[in-house]
Swiss-Prot record:
Name recorded for this polypeptide: Ankycorbin
Organismal lineage: Eukaryota, Metazoa, Chordata, Craniata, Vertebrata
Any GO molecular function: actin binding
Residues that bear N-acetylmethionine: M1
Any one biological process term the GO annotation gives: cell differentiation
Cytoplasm as UniProt keyword: yes
Primary location: cytoplasm
Compositional bias (Basic and acidic residues): 247-259
Organism whose genome encodes this protein: Homo sapiens (Human)
SMART domains: ANK (SM00248)
């Protein structure tokens, strides 16, 4: 029977058996042959789950054993099988970056778009791990690139989040959505800016990522780039914003064209002279970006001829046009500076500084050229505003260069036009570059303004949260802070106004480009009113002197006009020297004023630094004051709660008194409602007796009337009988009968009415009797309410006692609350004391830390000395080793000598002396060997001791005795070295 049962027993294939364990072990070891043999056995399955939820198929994919996977696939394993976590073999291969396994699975028709429990595909895991080959294979097999997981992430977002820029490039090239967002509203650009991956940011911007998108918190990509503190990413974003703004609002070039037209009309130069701007070379770009690279180039022979003769006015006018354009562009930059926020103005002003410095250097070069040829025209370039006035005067003369040129001019008109073309083209190129830079700055300023607005919104929301607090002191603090903010804003505005005035002076030529670097950061400073007034006075003085310089320049220009008209008069040498000395004095005065202003500025900076330090100290004091204010607020809250408790207890007492009064009133009202007064009862009894007597009289009357009616009936019957006896006619008889019938009917009706009346009266009498009985019962019960009254009184007294006990309990609770408040106050005082103790402990701990640091430094120094000593000891050991080697060599020599002596002794039978000498030498050799062994032992012991001490010193566990010994050793070593 057992054999039959065994034959017909069905083997359960889902149960875990030994073959499955062996299969897992073979996959773990990567033994493909063993895997193939085990899969051929019954009961073994590659997709069977163990107790931990693992399968052999998934383990092979996770470990990257391609041969094992191939064997399993040939045995017909389910490729789409998932483990307990919802991962397929493809997911695990991608998660562990095994691209060969991914290729094998995809070739065996494993779906690339399969999703696990978190909504991720294999491409999600490959992108997150940064395996480019796996991503390429999955994309070749058309894995969905823009499929989102449960968190809203596409593979591009995961690649950017983990900083894999190569995969980001690849996915973007294969159609990944650049502006895709996750559930928190973040795009790939925001994530790249947050982690600071400049390569990913660059790739995303090239593929058209939208910089204006905002996440669920209201932050854009520029905000996250500031969090990462990567200047390269910030510059990339700002340049992209500026380019987008250029495409949207192409108004700036038109304004520039209008300015150029106006300047050309003022100068009066013919349109043919303006050559088209050449393409921007790298050298020019470097000239614009780095002001230090600009150097003054020497003039050629043709240019010297050109500047030596009167027609050089055309080039002066072109230079003035360029400078006018530059002044307009700088005014645009100044207006932008007012709009930008404090945080971004520093970066933008630093960029502007570089550009302004490069321009000023270029202008200096031109001025040097002019000064080399004509000092009068060089002085004419000192003020920027004077160019506009001179252009109108020089217009007609520039329009007729042939008439004004003297016959002794060496340069031809073609040379003049060529030199003018070169200068104008260079200047136009630089102006265009500056305009582009200014447009970039405008974009950056707009983006910074948007961020400033966001910050203001956050500030307002935080203020609203602060306002929600109950403490009035917090609101007072916030109002104080807002007042301080307003004051700082007003100071900031005043400082900005002064910056603008300084920049205007830059245009007038009063401020040097070197001082511009100092003034660029002036907007950060909060200057007091007295300093501002002093600076304003200095500026006014400088402006007055600039006006004087303008007048001098105008006089020079008038002289130039006279020279153009034909009166070519060469000034004498004395006048030229006087003019030169006057201009030198003016320049020296201006330099002195600049130095004075710079000193003032430095003093203001120092004072502002002091103010900042005081502000910081005030902020720390305010923080401590806020803690004290919070404590005071808590004390006030406790006092208010005590007051509320006392008020509630008073209200409770009043309510109890009212309750007692109400109960007394209610008891009286209930008694009066339930019982009738005796006088009222007697009146009611009298009324009922009277009504009863009346009813009895009415009854007697009704009975008498009834008897009368009966008598009349009897009489009538007798009459009828008599009439019957006496014969009467039928008609009369009928009449009599009808009359009698009617009379009988009437009488019957009267009788029925009387009966009804009697019944009603009897009912009334019964009611009155009932009332009498009830009144009698009430009268009998009138003696009972005293007991009930006593019961009520006792119950009320018990309630009063209960209420009194409750009152006592409430009073006790109040006392407990009061005691708790006292305890809380004492605890607060204890906390204060503990806080003070903790602060003292902190100070002491800090001192201990400082002492420990000093000790640690000393220990380090001692360690260094120990190391030196160890090095010296090693050197000594080396010397000892050398000596030992020498001794061993001597010993060998002695042994050889002994051997030779022994041979001689054998041969010549040496004397006893030689044998004694040999023995002595052997003893010396033994002694030396013993000394060597002892030295080695001592050396090893010293090394072990030093090692132990060094370890203890590193761990900070060196004993004081050891330190003293080490110090003594070091002093001994020093003394020995000094003696040597």
């Amino acid at each position: 029977m057992k054999s039959l049962k065994a034959k017909f027993r069905k083997s359960d294939t889902n149960e875990w058996n030994k073959n499955d364990d062996r299969l897992l072990q073979a996959v773990e070891n990567g033994d493909a042959e063993k895997v193939a043999s085990l899969l051929g056995k019954k009961g073994a399955s590659a997709t069977k789950h163990d107790s931990e939820g693992k399968t052999a198929f998934h383990l092979a994919a996770a470990k990257g054993h391609v041969e094992c996977l191939r064997v399993m696939i040939t045995h017909g394993v389910d490729v789409t099988a998932q483990d307990t976590t919802g991962h397929s073999a493809l997911h695990l291969a991608a998660k562990n970056s095994h691209h060969e396994c991914i290729r094998k699975l995809l070739q065996s028709k494993c779906p690339a778009e399969s999703v696990d429990s978190s909504g991720k595909t294999a491409l999600h895991y490959a992108a997150a791990q940064g395996c480019l080959q796996a991503v390429q294979i999955l994309c070749e097999h058309k894995s969905p690139i823009n499929l989102k997981d449960l968190d809203g992430n596409i593979p591009l977002l995961l690649a950017v989040q983990n900083g894999h820029s190569e995969i980001c490039h690849f996915l973007l090239d294969h159609g990944a959505d650049v502006n895709s967002r996750n559930k928190s509203g973040r795009t790939a650009l925001m994530l790249a800016c947050e982690i600071g991956s400049s390569n990913a940011v660059e790739a995303l911007i090239k593929k058209g990522a939208d910089l204006n998108l905002v996440d669920s918190l209201g932050y854009n990509a520029l905000h996250y780039s500031k969090l990462s503190e990567n200047a390269g990413i910030q510059s990339l974003l700002l340049s992209k914003i500026s380019q987008d703004a250029d495409l949207k609002t192409p108004t700036k070039p038109k304004q520039h064209d209008q300015v150029s037209k106006i300047s050309s009309e003022r100068s009066g130069t013919p349109k043919k002279r303006k050559a088209p701007p050449p393409p921007i070379s790298p050298t020019q770009l470097s000239d614009v970006s780095s002001p230090r690279s600009i150097t003054s180039t020497p003039l050629s022979g043709k240019e010297s001829v050109f500047f030596a003769e009167p027609p050089f006015k055309a080039e002066i006018s072109s230079i003035r046009e360029n400078k006018d354009r530059l002044s307009d562009s700088t005014t645009g930059a100044d207006s932008l500076l007012d709009i930008s926020s404090e945080a971004d103005q520093q970066d933008l002003l630093s960029l502007l500084q570089a550009k302004v410095a490069s321009l000023t250097l270029h202008n200096k070069e031109l001025q040097d050229k002019l000064q080399a040829k004509s000092p009068k025209e060089a002085e004419a370039d000192l003020s920027f505003d004077s160019y506009h006035s001179t252009q109108t005067d020089l217009g007609p003369s520039l329009g007729k260069p042939g008439e004004t040129s003297p016959p002794d001019s060496k340069s031809s008109p073609s040379v003049l036009i060529h030199s003018l073309g070169k200068s104008t083209t260079d200047n136009d190129v630089r102006i265009q570059q500056l305009q582009e830079i200014l447009q970039d700055l405008q974009k950056r300023l707009e983006s910074s303004e948007a961020e400033r607005k966001q910050l203001q919104v956050e500030l307002q929301s935080r203020r609203a949260e602060l306002v929600c607090l109950n403490n009035t002191e917090i609101s007072e603090n916030s109002s104080d802070l807002s007042q301080k903010l307003k004051e700082t804003q007003s100071k900031y505005e005043e400082a900005m106004k002064e910056v603008l005035s300084v920049q205007k002076q830059m245009k007038l030529g009063l401020v040097s480009p070197e001082s511009m670097d100092n003034y660029s950061h002036f907007h950060e400073l909060r200057v007091t009113e007295e300093e501002i007034n002093v600076l304003k006075q200095d500026l006014q003085n400088a402006l007055e002197e600039s006006e004087r310089n303008k007048e001098k320049v105008r006089e020079l220009e008038e002289k130039l006009v006279e020279r153009e008209k034909g009166t070519v008069i060469k000034p004498p040498v004395e006048e030229y020297e006087e003019m030169k000395s006057s201009y030198c004095s003016v320049i020296e005065n201006m330099n002195k004023e600049k130095a004075f202003l710079f000193e003032k500025y430095q003093e203001a900076q120092e004072e502002i630094m002091k103010l900042k330090d005081t502000l910081k100290s005030q902020m720390t004091q305010e923080a401590s004051d806020e803690a004290e204010d919070m404590k005071e607020a808590m004390n006030r809250m406790i006092d208010e709660l005590n007051k509320q408790v006392s008020e509630l207890s008073q209200l409770y007492k009043e309510a109890q008194a009212e309750l007692e009064d109400y109960r007394k009133r209610k008891s009286l009202e209930d008694v009066t409602a339930e019982y009738i007064h005796k006088a009222e009862h007697e009146k009611l009894m009298q009324l009922t007796n009277v009504s009863r007597a009346k009813a009895e009289d009415a009854l007697s009357e009704m009975k008498s009337q009834y008897s009368k009616v009966l008598n009349e009936l009897t009489q009538l019957k007798q009459l009828v009988d008599a009439q019957k006896e006496n014969s009467v006619s039928i008609t009369e008889h009928l009449q009599v009968i009808t009359t009698l019938r009617t009379a009988a009917k009437e009488m019957e009706e009267k009788i029925s009415n009387l009966k009804e009346h009697l019944a009603s009266k009897e009912v009334e009498v019964a009611k009155l009797e009932k009332q009498l009985l009830e009144e009698k019962a009430a009268m009998t019960d009138a003696m009972v309410p005293r007991s009930s009254y006593e019961k009520l009184q006792s119950s009320l007294e018990s309630e009063v006692s209960v209420l009194a006990s409750k009152l006592k309990e409430s009073v006790k609770e109040k006392e407990k609350v009061h005691s708790e408040v006292v305890q809380i106050r004492s605890e607060v005082s204890q906390v204060k004391r503990e806080k003070e103790n903790i602060q003292t402990l902190l100070k002491s701990k800090e001192q201990e830390v400082n002492e420990l640091l000093q000790k640690f430094q000393q220990a380090q120094e001692e360690l260094a000395e120990m190391k030196r000593y160890a090095e010296s000891s090693s050197k000594l050991e080396e010397d000892k080793d050398k000596k030992i080697n020498e001794m061993s060599k001597e010993v060998t020599k002695l042994k050889e000598a002994l051997n030779s002596l022994s041979q001689l002794s054998y041969s010549t039978s040496s004397s006893k002396r030689q044998s004694q000498q040999l023995e002595a030498l052997q003893q010396q050799v033994k002694q030396l060997q013993n000394q060597l062994a002892e030295c080695k032992k001592q050396h090893q012991e010293v090394i072990s001791v030093y090692r132990m001490h060094l370890l203890y010193a590193v761990q900070g566990q060196m004993d004081e005795d050891v330190q003293k010994v080490l110090k003594q050793i070091l002093t001994m070593c020093k003394n020995q070295s000094q003696k040597k």
